[in-house]
Amino acid sequence: MCAPQQQAGATTGAAARPPAATERRTVLKVAGAGGLALTFSTALGAGSPAYAAGNRDRRRAYVLVVDGCRPDEIDSGLMPNLAALRADGRHFPRAHSLPVMETLPNHVMMMTGVRPDRGGVPANEIYDRGLGETRTMDRPRDIRTTTVIERLGRRGFRTGTVLSKDYLYGVFGERATHRWEPFPLLPVTDHAPDVFTMEAALGMVEELDPHLVFVNLGDVDRVGHSDLTGGSLQALRRAALASTDLQVGRFVEMLRSTGRWKRSIVVVLADHSMDWSRPDRVVSLTSPLAADPLLAGNVAVAQNGGADLLYWTGPAKQRDRGVARMLEVARGTAGVLSAHDRARSSWLRLGPDAGDVVAYCRAGWRFSDPMVVSNPIPGNHGHPATRPIPFFVGGGHPAAAKAVSSSLAATVDVAPTIAEFFGLRGAPRGGWDGRSRI
């Protein structure tokens, strides 16, 4: 689940977040393409003509994340701009999201090029053992490695983030040269509509001209969390797809009209897809775990829509027994697809912040913890059913030459792709977990 529904006792990092302007940053105000006044937080001195001229490399890279988009939706006839961009670029039809198939971990993987066991942020929601409560992983320090944003910045390249969701703005913090604070934020969804996000992206590119701009478009995801069993809500989903495609079309047209197209790549992907459940297809593990004599009072649950993360909080000497029992209870609960001992399932690559047991629900189901009513959202992700994503590299630069590949591209491939495009030498300590797709 990526709608920001806090669980009981949950906290976010918003209170600790630095303000838009600090001693290291200043505020720039520019006029957007549609006449909207735009405000960007910019690294101190980065708005000066001298700074803008400091790196004269003419290559440009733009990463557009169509949050929550399913691959088949680009073929629906509602997204002609994205379909054309895909048809003329490098297309990876077998691309996939990575565990946990949620917004925060997959955006972080895009910009770090490493899996959560190395880079942090395994899920949207975790149980923070230090705090003793569940929280959102939206703090800048939750990312525990260097992003490609920072790697570019250290070599004199200008970077920018235009992220529609409040928690994405939070976790990436002040890493970029220029960043836009999402505004206006809609109540409940905590995201800025795509029309405002795209105005900010257009304004940032035209006025500040970063070498790399990382954009999240959140409308498709936010509408996707609604129940699609009714005709009116199906219409909302279709309208969101068409509207987001229109915004992408505006961006491509701007690149062409300003002469940037031929020296640019445009990486388009989703962070996850979407799955829908009926009101009666709900899994809540809190009650069966609490009903077990060994587990009662000794387990914390972090609910992530299509995945539950379970944490043993009891005596350390009983941990092995506790984990074995958690696995047994989870696997015996209707609607659960699978449950895994996180420490013994090396392929998950999630790290200790993801707890002791990772449980996935079946397609057409959702988790809701701590209570059955805690997650009323029918549209969810995080489980294997939401693994397929669109992934393609468009643009006028030769690196985006038309091709179709059967390779298993993934969200973690974005950072090494950007690094190769700009000729960055070296890789994170331990190497990339992803690989370049150009």
Predicted features, each with a name:
Residues 302-417:
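Active-site neighborhoods of enzymes that stabilize oxyanions during catalysis
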Residues 68-208, 310, 433-437:
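Active-site-proximal alpha/beta segments of enzymes that process anionic O-linked groups
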Residues 35, 40-41, 51-90:
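Active-site-proximal N-terminal segment of extracellular/periplasmic enzymes that hydrolyze or transfer
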Residues 1-22:
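N-terminal secretory signal peptides
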Residues 166-184, 197-250, 282:
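Active-site His/acidic residue clusters
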Residues 19-29, 35-54:
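N-terminal twin-arginine translocation
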Residues 274-309:
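Acidic/histidine-rich catalytic neighborhood
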Residues 62-63, 81, 243-285, 351, ...:
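Metal-dependent active-site segment of extracytoplasmic phospho-/sulfohydrolases and closely related
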